[in-house]
């Protein structure tokens, strides 16, 4: 049924897409379960590294949190490309069998050249990058950011291809394997004396491991269709789509995710410039705990995007869907914010240790700030589902202003967090001023059914 929906009954789509048939609900549930495990392992990594890294080891956990925030901002392109690649794969636009292999080989060669180039730039600019991120004592860790982003792009593309082939099992395993490898390798390298740099090195190493795994799984899919194509003869097929053209098609989701990533992560980097080493580590741990509702918003986004797309296609008002998604955030925020209000210190102390609890007083304010950001995230997803892009410039101006304002904010965690809250409130005001406008909707075609939500590109989820 999925093939019929995405192809709208057209002939000529390769039979290799039949891999998507079967229990799609079970596959989706398995992938969702893998995401849950991924997030649980990521949370465990945060707790392990917060306790393992001491403040006298190159800035301790505060430096690692800043480096991770830097990477998360860089990583958003990969998230958008993964979704776009999966869509193109389902529609058969990447080729099949040897044609698909040719496309992936060309893209991988381009990514290898790109990764080498940005790695050279990152090494040459390691001192300015370290200074900007606030990790002056970890210049080689700072130099890993751009190479890690290049590896992440390659991994995201490979995952997208596997998603397009319906191999959700491989995608799910790679999600869990990535976080598990990052935790194990990072912890070992940090424990043997490499400190913050060792802990951060686990990130690109985990990407390399999962790239090899995904490439092997993809090779099996290609080999499975090679026999059917062997008798066709002719020259080797060329790549079906260039990587540059592929990236251009995903520009709006990429821009939206960059804005969200900056609003979500730049405060930890700014904190490294405003606080002492010990306080920056404490703030980093507190900020990680405060962002729990962002994950709730991502889950609500899975519901919001297709439903908004469906209503848009049928000419209905999509705003009630946004209201329902916001209701999910509201319901979940009540117990979370109550815990932040009355048990902030015990919570941070239990999770990260007593040495990371100095900024626990700011947890409620930060919790409010990132609850607001969770709502902004849904508004941005809503606008992108409606194929609106004008708002991106206005929200981007807020994201640009945030680091400027935070670098001049209070040196006390609660005052600093209040500035974060004010910025998030402005961002939400801007996003919702665009989202709540009725605007034109696409009418249903006369005499025929409305276009399906599956015809409209889904919007990738943010991370972090």
Protein language model annotation of sequence segments:
Residues 1-41, 218, 232-256, 434-464:
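N-terminal membrane topogenesis motif
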Residues 2-11, 19-82, 122-123, 251-274:
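Signature of the first transmembrane helix
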Residues 22-39, 67-70, 75-126, 140, ...:
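Membrane-water interface segments that mark the loop-to-transmembrane alpha-helix transition
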Residues 26-46, 171, 175-178, 182, ...:
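Transmembrane helical elements of multi-pass membrane transporters/channels
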Residues 55-58, 126-145, 277-280, 341-371:
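Interfacial segments at transmembrane-helix termini and the short loops linking adjacent helices
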Residues 78-95, 164, 286, 290-314, ...:
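Helix-loop junctions and terminal segments of transmembrane helices
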Residues 139-146, 172-223, 414-438:
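Hydrophobic alpha-helical transmembrane segments
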Residues 150-173, 310, 368-394:
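Membrane-interface junctions at transmembrane-helix termini in multi-pass inner-membrane proteins
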């Amino acid at each position: 049924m999925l093939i019929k929906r995405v192809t709208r009954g057209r002939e000529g789509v390769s039979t290799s897409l039949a891999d998507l048939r079967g229990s799609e609900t079970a596959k989706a549930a398995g992938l969702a379960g893998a995401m849950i495990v991924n997030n649980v392992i990521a949370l465990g990594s945060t707790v392990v590294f917060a306790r393992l890294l001491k403040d006298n080891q190159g800035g301790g956990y505060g430096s690692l949190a800043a480096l991770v925030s830097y990477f998360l901002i860089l990583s958003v392109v990969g998230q958008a490309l993964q979704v776009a690649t999966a869509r193109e794969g389902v529609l058969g636009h990447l080729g099949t069998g040897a044609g698909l292999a040719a496309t992936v080989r060309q893209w991988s060669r381009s990514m290898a050249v790109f990764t080498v180039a940005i790695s050279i730039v990152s090494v040459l600019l390691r001192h300015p990058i370290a200074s900007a991120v606030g990790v002056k004592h970890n210049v080689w860790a700072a130099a890993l950011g751009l190479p890690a982003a290049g590896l992440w792009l390659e991994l995201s593309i490979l995952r997208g291809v596997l998603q397009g082939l319906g191999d959700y099992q491989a995608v799910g395993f790679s999600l869990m394997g990535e976080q598990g490898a990052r935790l194990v390798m990072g912890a070992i390298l940090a424990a043997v004396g490499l400190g913050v740099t060792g802990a951060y090195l686990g990130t690109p190493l985990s990407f390399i491991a999962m790239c090899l795994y995904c490439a092997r799984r993809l090779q099996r899919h290609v080999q499975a269709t090679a026999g059917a194509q062997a008798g066709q003869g002719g020259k080797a097929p060329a790549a079906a789509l260039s990587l540059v053209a592929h990236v251009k098609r995903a520009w709006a989701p990429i821009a939206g995710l960059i804005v969200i990533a900056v609003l979500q992560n730049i405060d930890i980097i700014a904190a490294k410039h405003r606080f002492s080493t010990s306080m920056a580590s404490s703030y980093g741990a507190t900020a990680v705990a405060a962002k729990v509702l962002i994950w709730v918003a991502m889950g609500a986004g899975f519901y919001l995007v297709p439903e908004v797309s469906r209503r848009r296609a049928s000419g209905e008002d999509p705003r009630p869907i946004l209201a329902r998604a916001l209701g999910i955030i509201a319901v979940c925020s009540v117990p979370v914010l109550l815990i932040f209000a009355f048990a902030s210190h015990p919570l941070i102390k239990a999770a990260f240790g007593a040495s990371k609890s100095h900024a626990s007083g700011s947890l409620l304010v930060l919790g409010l700030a990132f609850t607001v950001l969770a709502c902004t995230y849904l508004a941005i997803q809503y606008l992108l589902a409606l194929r609106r892009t004008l708002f991106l410039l206005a929200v981007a101006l807020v994201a640009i202003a945030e680091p400027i304002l935070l670098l001049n904010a209070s040196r006390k965690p609660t005052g600093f967090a209040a500035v974060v809250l004010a910025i998030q409130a402005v961002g939400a005001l801007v996003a919702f001023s665009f989202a709540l406008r009725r605007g034109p909707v696409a009418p249903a075609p006369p005499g025929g059914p409305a276009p399906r939500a599956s015809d409209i590109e889904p919007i990738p989820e943010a991370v972090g």
